[in-house]
Amino acid sequence: MTNPANPSPTLRVLVLAPTRRAASETFVRANLRRLPCKIVAYFGDERPLLAPLRLSYGLAILCSKALTRLGALRLATLPSSLVAWGLIRRHRPDVLMVEFGFHAVRVMEAAAWSGVPLVVHFRGSDASAQGRIGVLRERYQRLMKLVAGVIVKSQPMRAALLGLGAPADHLIVSPSGADEQLFGAAGSPKNAPPIFVAVGRFVAKKGPLLTIEAFGRMLQDLPDPLGRQARLVMVGEGPLWGEAKDLIASLGLKAAVSLEGVRSHKEVAQLLRGARAFVQHSLVAADGDSEGSPVAVMEAQLSGLPVVATRHGGIPEVVVEGATGFLVEEGDIAEMAKAMGRLALDSALAGRLGAAARIRAKGQFTVQHHLAQVGTLLAQVVWERRDRSPGG
């Protein structure tokens, strides 16, 4: 049998995800809709009374969560794994792909019982030493003995999982990438007004409050009339939205900062095309939550914008300091303000960095690149499992 470079349209993939909200994320949706495979997906928050399998799966995940909260980590695996095993028998997939590592430990025994190769897609805090790894270390070590393949978003995530025994030859670093269908049209930061755009949930790891503070400090140093022209546009919502609104008021930035709430991809793409730069102050949150490689950063670069961000997670693998943007240390508001100020003052510099960012994104960080890597891994683990089987 020849090892295929790409997945066959007949390849059957059973996808298990914790919630439908997770599936609404751009990167998960791309996996479900664009992989050239036969995909069936189940979600842990479903409770459809007229679909017994989906109801059973949702209830099993609920039970596993409750047992996890009680500290019965080994027992927590059984309800979900039993139902997942039933799903495998029902759908007979060639490969099982589970979204998020913390969800994989709930269903991992089903892969062991069935012999179906298991591929796990880690995305952020689920592969953070400060986050869930600390709580689930023993379970993750068991998971790494069962997986046939692992997908992560950044080199720090790769290092963390290698330390737990992940198979190095089947562990790929594959940022989710930007969608060229949505963000393929380039803006012109050289000709744009000094508008800075931030896109992301208002949660601690995205650092929205620090971004606002850095913008406010930048305004203090900008000469007129540039200081009166500069704007910060923030897209998203979340638990820190109220604090962000209060901070804007306390800093006297109501005229310069706008909170746009949730916007469609089309609207975000339009905002990016009219901006000077993209900004994001990612950092490790107090609870250990952290980023992989933020999709919004790649979308901004594909749109031709320079990026001002932090040396956090996989961001330094995407943003090249001084070539496609500027990087600062987590929590360094002064340096972030200075980097933003450079782009506000020098539109030609913004244009050069943005052009380089677009070239780099098109060459390495698109959804198409990501799906090609994922598809190849899925095909590889299936081929290897069949090759080792008695009839292979």
Predicted feature descriptions by range:
Residues M1-L55:
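N-terminal subdomain of nucleotide-sugar transferases
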Residues L14, G187-R217, V233:
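Conserved donor-binding/catalytic core segment of Leloir-type glycosyltransferases
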Residues V98-A104, F122:
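Short His-centered aromatic/hydrophobic patch
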Residues P156, G177:
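Carbohydrate-associated surface elements
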Residues E243-K266:
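Nucleotide-activated donor-binding/catalytic signature segment of Leloir-type glycosyltransferases, i.e.
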Residues R273-G288, L305:
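Acidic donor-binding loop of glycosyltransferase active sites
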Residues V297, L302, P306-A309, V319:
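Short hydrophobic beta-strand element within catalytic cores of glycosyltransferases
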Residues V318-G322, F326-I333, R342-A348:
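Conserved acidic donor-binding segment of nucleotide-sugar-dependent glycosyltransferases
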